[in-house]
Amino acid sequence: MQAEILLTLKLQQKLFADPRRISLLKHIALSGSISQGAKDAGISYKSAWDAINEMNQLSEHILVERATGGKGGGGAVLTRYGQRLIQLYDLLAQIQQKAFDVLSDDDALPLNSLLAAISRFSLQTSARNQWFGTITARDHDDVQQHVDVLLADGKTRLKVAITAQSGARLGLDEGKEVLILLKAPWVGITQDEAVAQNADNQLPGIISHIERGAEQCEVLMALPDGQTLCATVPVNEATSLQQGQNVTAYFNADSVIIATLC
C-alpha cells in the first residue's frame, strides 16, 4: 500500500525540513541558483530565501552557500552537509513507507519491538530460520561464552555460543533483545530423541512438507508456536521421514548466529 507520509524535521522547536524545503534544496542543487531553484520548486524567491536562511541558522552547518554564476542568476551551491541532509531525508522517507507497509504485509509482526520491525523491512539474510528472543543468562568465560535465549513464544529456550569479544561488543547481557539466525544445513531432523539429546538445542515439531532432491532434501517443520523451521538434510538421512511425523530438530550452540541493535 503506497501511503502519502509527510516527513517533517524540527530543530529548536522550529521547522527545519519538510517536503517543500527538501524539494527546494534539490532544485537548487540541479540549477546552481536560488532563484531558478525557487521557480522550479514552485515557490517565490523570497519564500525560498527565507527558508534557506532559517535552515542555515537552525543547523550546526551551512546547507547552502552563495556562488558565482548559476542558471537564472543568484548563484548558490549545496554544501556537503546540505547534500547529506537530502540523502538522509529520502532515506527516512523510505523507512517510513516500509514501516507502514508492515501493517498490511505481516499482521503477525510485533510492532512493539524495534529490532523486529527493522529486521522485517530492512534486514534480508540467507538464513531460513529467524527467531526473536531475549537474553536470559550469559556466562563469562575467557574465550568462548554461552548465552541462554528465551524466544518470543515465552517458552522455547536456546543455547548460543559466542566469543567473549562478541558478547562485549554486542552488549549481550540479560534482557537484551536479539535476533536468532540459523541456516537450514546446520539443522538435523530425527525421530530418535536419543540422537537429538546429543546436541545443545532440540525443538520438537511436525513435518509439514518435504522437498526431495537428488542429493539433499528440504524439510519444513511446524513448531508448537506456529512458526516453521527449515532444514536441509542429505537424501540418505531423509528416507524414513514423512509428512505428518512427529520429529525433533536439533543443532549445536555454535551453529547459531545472533544479531541485535547496538
From Swiss-Prot:
I: annotated span: 1-121
UniProt function note: Functions as an intracellular molybdate sensor. The ModE-Mo complex acts as a repressor of the modABC operon, which is involved in the transport of molybdate. Binds modA promoter DNA in the absence of molybdate, however molybdate binding confers increased DNA affinity. Binds the promoter of moaA activating its transcription; binding is not enhanced by molybdate. The protein dimer binds the consensus palindrome sequence 5'-TATAT-N7-TAYAT-3' and a variant 5'-TGTGT-N7-TGYGT-3'.
Residue ranges, annotated region (Required for dimer formation and molybdate binding): 125-133
Activity modulation: The ModE dimer binds two molecules of molybdate (MoO4(2-)) with a Kd of 0.8 uM, which results in major changes in the conformation of the DNA-binding domain and confers high-affinity DNA-binding to the transcription factor. Additionally molybdate binding moves the 2 Mop domains closer together, trapping the ligand between them. Can also bind tungstate. Molybdate is bound at the dimer interface using residues from each monomer.
Protein name (database record): DNA-binding transcriptional dual regulator ModE
Main location: cytoplasm
Family per record: Belongs to the ModE family.
Subcellular location(s) of the protein: Cytoplasm
Residues in Mop domain copies: 124-191, 196-260
Consequence when changing residue 76 to V: Partial loss of repression by ModE
Effect after changing residue 125 to I: Transcription repression by ModE even in the absence of molybdate
Positions with a binding annotation for molybdate: 126, 128, 163, 166, 183-184
Key words, A-Z: Activator, Cytoplasm, DNA-binding, Metal-binding, Molybdenum, Repeat, Repressor, Transcription, Transcription regulation, Transport
GO cellular component: cytosol; ModE complex
GO BP of this protein: molybdate ion transport; negative regulation of DNA-templated transcription; negative regulation of DNA-templated transcription initiation; positive regulation of DNA-templated transcription; regulation of DNA-templated transcription
Domain notes: Deletion of the C-terminus (from residues 122 on) results in constitutive repression of modA. Contains two major domains: the N-terminal domain I forms a winged helix-turn-helix motif and interacts with DNA. The C-terminal domain II is the olybdate-binding component and contains a tandem repeat of the Mop domain, each of which forms a beta-barrel. The N-terminal domain plays a major role in the dimerization of the protein whereas the C-terminal domain contributes to the stability of the complex.
DNA-binding region: 33-79
One Gene Ontology MF term: cis-regulatory region sequence-specific DNA binding
Assembly description: Homodimer.
Observed phenotype of the null mutant: Loss of repression of the modABC operon. Not essential for molybdopterin cofactor synthesis. Increased dmsA expression under aerobic conditions and reduced expression under anaerobic conditions. Decreased expression of hyc and narG.
Induction conditions: Constitutively expressed at low levels; probably part of the modE-modF operon. Does not seem to be autoregulated.
